[in-house]
């Protein structure tokens, strides 16, 4: 088992697909740093007013790619479903086509191979998803100060882990990256399961993207209908 896992991880991390995904994601994180963060350094005190409790100087929390709504994070939220399937999610399909899987099945190691494959797909997907955010956060921390939230500055004090955000905003960001890592691995696992039946590599890599995007739109639409159908809104004359 351990030997097979090492082989699959070696194949995954030395493949050009993972490097391509990390390069594309890294360019997105770097683009935000160059276009958004660096220009904000010269205006670091513009939003600070000593008499206003909620005002703060320019800081990492509000400026890094995952801190506030910006063009780069919107792009990331769309392309991340492709970034996580590029590295290794379709490798079962390619192994089956190349005959590697047949050789493994003959040796009676297919179940071990599937476990090792799943672990490698999970880890590479998480790395691909988190790398742009981690790179951008580290770059932003080199030019802007880290300021911990207080209750006046919380974007949503009812959100998950807000107490942690007040104590240590960097740890708070890292916790969310861990969650992104896990969900990315699970979604890539969906692509791996599809490769058991699909006969096209493009389908294996793109179907999770389509499923996530379409389901996200449907949930948003459903929630909007629920919001519109609230009794207070139905009875409102405005």
Q: Language-model segments: which ranges?
A:
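Aromatic- and glycine-rich beta-strand/loop motifs that create alpha-glucan
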Residues: 1-26
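Alpha-helical membrane-protein architecture signal
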Residues: 2-6, 111, 115, 170-174
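Secretory targeting signals
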Residues: 25-90, 118-188, 192, 196, ...
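Central hydrophobic cores of alpha-helical transmembrane segments
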Residues: 21-26, 201-215
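Helix-loop-helix units of permease transmembrane domains in multi-pass membrane transporters
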Residues: 89-124
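Single conserved hydrophobic/aromatic residue that forms the stacking wall/gate
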Residues: 226-238
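Alpha-helical transmembrane segments of multipass membrane proteins
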Residues: 192-193, 213, 217
